[in-house]
UniProtKB/Swiss-Prot annotation:
GO terms for molecular function: 4 iron, 4 sulfur cluster binding; iron ion binding; NADH:ubiquinone reductase (non-electrogenic) activity; quinone binding. HAMAP family: NDH1_NuoI. The gene is nuoI2. Keywords: 4Fe-4S, Cell membrane, Iron, Iron-sulfur, Membrane, Metal-binding, NAD, Quinone, Repeat, Translocase. Its main location: membrane. Binds 2 [4Fe-4S] clusters per subunit. InterPro entries: 4Fe4S_Fe-S-bd, 4Fe4S_Fe_S_CS, NADH_quinone_OxRdtase_chainI. Coiled coil: none annotated. NDH-1 is composed of 14 different subunits. Subunits NuoA, H, J, K, L, M, N constitute the membrane sector of the complex. It is found in: Cell membrane. It comes from Mycolicibacterium paratuberculosis (strain ATCC BAA-968 / K-10). This is NADH-quinone oxidoreductase subunit I 2.
Length: 181
């Protein structure tokens, strides 16, 4: 008799859930909410004037435990400027076949160029399409942004960009008036 009661107790969860109302997830038509800090697809961010935040330092690639990131830096010139600093990430690739979504690359980035979005739909039937190049990772240009390459905002320094003093229309008014930086 004790063995029978043990078997009934073992199936207690099963029996309890058999008589509950079923919940249907309508996933493809109505995606559910994700947590605000969900680690989804990566995004390379831009400054308000359109220049890229990535300086090609390769710290994200060094921090990646899965070796999923490849960065090749190049030097900026005054004629062809992609970021406000001396360098920019000429080649940037993330291999989502290897990425484990840990976010260590985001923590390692000194300019906050790399963030993770809430986009989780990255499935594909072609392995080559899961290696995201820079053009798929860059944040879209907003209407007031200018596509790089273009010169820095007039009178702006690297420090102005990193402190957030540059807007889509140039330096903030307080900075032009001569307030200390």
């Amino acid at each position: 008799m004790a063995k029978f009661l043990d078997a009934v107790a073992g199936f207690g969860v099963t029996f309890a859930s058999m008589f509950k109302k079923h919940v249907t997830e309508e996933y493809p038509e109505k995606p559910g909410p994700v947590a605000p800090r969900y680690h989804g697809r990566h995004q390379l961010n831009r400054y308000p004037d359109g220049l890229e935040k990535c300086i090609g330092c390769e710290l994200c690639a060094w921090a990646c435990p899965a070796d999923a990131i490849y960065v090749e830096g190049a030097d900026n010139t005054e004629e062809l400027r992609y970021s406000p600093g001396e360098r920019y990430g000429r080649v940037y690739q993330i291999n989502y076949l290897r990425c484990i979504g840990c976010g260590l690359c985001v923590e390692a980035c000194p300019t906050r160029a790399l963030t993770m979005t809430n986009d989780y739909e990255m499935a594909d039937d072609n392995r080559a399409d899961l290696i995201y190049e820079k053009d798929r990772l860059l944040a879209p240009l907003l209407p007031e942004m200018t596509a790089p390459p273009h010169p820095r905002a007039p009178g702006a320094t690297d420090k102005d960009y990193y402190l957030g003093n540059v807007t889509a229309h140039g330096l903030r008014e307080a900075q032009r008036a001569g307030e200390p930086r």
